[in-house]
């Protein structure tokens, strides 16, 4: 059984037991606008399929350390591999706009993103069939959320770029079948997309030169998780790099 197949099985089990989400009480923010010309999306990520990253940093402490230099937050809500929780969303929302990251296969998860206060929701293109991915993205848009549609190759990126509505393409440096990361491959996809659609680059970025490269390719931002979880103060340097790049564009 490959990773994505196993993911779907665990999500189906979760959906069978999760309670309905609360009614939304937090304001809805335009996630794309919050990124400005180029944003740092700081992710709260306690673990990954490769193992535990950090358990001694509670969400409120992480967000308090990085919010000054981050444009938005990404929050993992998947509990099995990422030790995530929907309850982290409103904590993040107290500081910045929020992207909910999970393995979304059902509209109920989008309703949860909305109910707990997220402004954007991740939809992984390879996790579901094409028509299902489009349906989920459209449903998110109807609720006022920004769908961030995650891809890892040029062909899928070009396909998603033809979809209607307000969305962001998330170029993932990680191959979800092998879990291998290749940042240079993500940059190649970004070059093919430049000017066609709003996009961000995700996974595996940690160095200032990688952030500068993403900015020079006219990404709307970068999503950084592991590097900032291990060293939250890095966000200041990355923000400074981004601002210098924006000034040169």
From Swiss-Prot:
It catalyses: 1-(2-carboxyphenylamino)-1-deoxy-D-ribulose 5-phosphate + H(+) = (1S,2R)-1-C-(indol-3-yl)glycerol 3-phosphate + CO2 + H2O. The keyword Lyase applies. InterPro entries: Aldolase_TIM (IPR013785), Indole-3-glycerol_P_synth (IPR045186), Indole-3-glycerol_P_synth_dom (IPR013798), Indole-3-GlycerolPSynthase_CS (IPR001468), RibuloseP-bd_barrel (IPR011060). Pfam families: IGPS. Signal peptide: none annotated. Coiled coil: none annotated. GO terms for molecular function: indole-3-glycerol-phosphate synthase activity; phosphoribosylanthranilate isomerase activity. One of its GO terms (biological process) is L-tryptophan biosynthetic process. Pathway: Amino-acid biosynthesis; L-tryptophan biosynthesis; L-tryptophan from chorismate: step 4/5. CDD domains: IGPS (cd00331). SUPFAM superfamilies: Ribulose-phoshate binding barrel. Keywords: Amino-acid biosynthesis, Aromatic amino acid biosynthesis, Decarboxylase, Lyase, Tryptophan biosynthesis. The keyword Cell inner membrane does not apply. Its EC number is 4.1.1.48. Belongs to the TrpC family. PANTHER family: INDOLE-3-GLYCEROL-PHOSPHATE SYNTHASE, TRYPTOPHAN BIOSYNTHESIS PROTEIN. This is Indole-3-glycerol phosphate synthase. It comes from Pyrobaculum aerophilum (strain ATCC 51768 / DSM 7523 / JCM 9630 / CIP 104966 / NBRC 100827 / IM2).
